[in-house]
């Protein structure tokens, strides 16, 4: 039997941070179309474009994220990207212009791309090499659990808290 531990404080922190990252992502994903339609009165095509800006930005930053993580200290890059990712949620609430919302969406995607690559890299650094596959499996499980509950809770909160549909 292998005595290399997976469950360490560092692993628990990165696992919890990964769950919260994806939970936040999936929490707002199903309600953003409603928000964009109601706040900016735009059509489905524009909503689709705005939502895709996030993913495209995340895709564009990932190759550069790997280089940055190999060149600079990983933990500070991870924490800065995570902070930006979190702060952008507040920006969505105060964005009164559609162009500002789109810009926030792009920055949010960059932060998401950076923090996911950084999280995966840090995970590999902290796992014992003999149990990396198992540790990565648990780490990925956090994404799936967030995917299972995030959209449901987001839509529930939207239905519960949004009052303009009550008329």
Where are these regions (language model features)?
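Paired small-residue
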Residues: 99-107
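Helix-breaking motifs and short loop linkers at transmembrane-helix boundaries and internal kinks
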Residues: 41, 73, 94-99
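Conserved small/polar residues in nucleotide/adenosyl-binding loops
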Residues: 162-167
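Structural signature of the two symmetry-related core transmembrane helices
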Residues: 76-90
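Helix-loop boundary and gating motifs at the non-cytosolic
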Residues: 10-40, 47
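Residue-level signature of mid-helix packing/kink "hotspots" within the transmembrane helices
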Residues: 55-63, 147-148
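Helix-to-loop junctions at the C-terminal end of transmembrane segments
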Residues: 62-73
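Cytoplasmic helix-loop-helix junction between adjacent transmembrane helices
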Residues: 106-141
């Amino acid at each position: 039997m292998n005595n290399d531990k997976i469950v360490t404080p560092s692993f628990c922190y990165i696992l919890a941070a990964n769950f919260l990252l994806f939970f936040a992502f999936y929490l707002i994903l199903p309600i953003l179309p409603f928000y964009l339609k109601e706040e900016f009165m735009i059509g489905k095509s524009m909503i689709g474009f705005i939502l895709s800006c996030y993913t495209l930005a995340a895709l564009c930053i990932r190759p550069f994220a790997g280089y940055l993580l190999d060149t600079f200290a990983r933990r500070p890059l991870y924490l800065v990207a995570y902070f930006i990712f979190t702060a952008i949620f507040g920006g969505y609430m105060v964005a009164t212009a559609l162009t500002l919302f789109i810009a926030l969406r792009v920055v949010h995607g960059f932060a998401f791309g950076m923090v996911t690559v950084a999280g995966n890299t840090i995970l590999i650094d902290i796992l014992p090499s003999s149990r990396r596959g198992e540790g990565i499996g648990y780490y990925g499980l956090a994404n799936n659990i967030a995917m299972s509950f995030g959209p449901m809770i987001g839509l529930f909160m939207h239905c519960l808290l949004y009052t303009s549909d009550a008329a």
